[in-house]
Amino acid sequence: MTDIAGDLHNSATVYPERVPAIDRLAPSVRPSQRAVMRQKWRDLLFVHWPIRPEAVRPLVPPQVELDLFDGKAYVGLVPFTMTGVRPVGLPAVPGVSSFHETNVRTYVRLANCDPGVWFFNLEAASAIAVRLARRLFYLPYHYARMFLEHEPTSQANEPTSILYAGTRHWPGPLPASYAIRAQPSGPIQPAASGSLEHFLVERYILFTIRNKLLYQGRVHHTPYPLQPARVLSLDETLLDAAGIDRPETPPLAHFASGVNVDVFPLRRV
């Protein structure tokens, strides 16, 4: 992705938000075409920071616009576990179909539709998944060693905390690692339409670039069973490896126990 950045991202234009013109519920409707993959996403932690639009505009291609909420762009760090990853019609393969994953993202859209995700980088603890995703979905995957641990609590009424950690091995840039300890607590419910939480997590479209051509991918799942979370500790260099200066403001965090996901083929935009 970095070799594209130099000749595609010269414009620093920040586009105004046009939220009223965007249907943010339409992408959650299941696409009519046949899914190509099925997978389960578990123990998702969404960690977000508001950021100045001009700080991330040069890092995304000119074919998309930044998707803003109240005039702010957001960058996210999202670790989770994938299980049951398989092509439609084939069984999952033990030792291959389950692995940890983490992504660094922002939110983009087309001129007045299709609010989606732009991935700066994605880490996966499966070398096979990394190679396939880079080849088939044109996504900037990296192989990383990662682990996720549900930590016991010292008091009966205290919510469980979860430790997410990982270190990138290849390809670069290096170093790139993270260690996040978070504590989910509070009511579990889908994000309300029109809320910041809905804007951040209910994303069913991704965009990616290959040979300067823009592609769009779709996923489908039920709304996340979302829960507030508290970040107890955070040490990471993934944002820096993506060319992003992490904002100094405390992050906004949410947790979801998981959803079952259908993945649809890429198409040219």
Tell where the protein language model's regions lie, with residue ranges:
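Extended, compositionally biased
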Residues: 73-124
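Internal, well-folded beta-alpha domain core
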Residues: 44, 103-269
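Hydrophobic, proline/glycine-rich low-complexity stretches
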Residues: 2-88, 238-239, 244-269
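Generic preference for flexible, low-structure residues
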Residues: 57, 62, 72, 76, ...
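Short, surface-exposed, charge-dense and proline/glycine-enriched linear segments
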Residues: 20-25, 93-105, 148-154
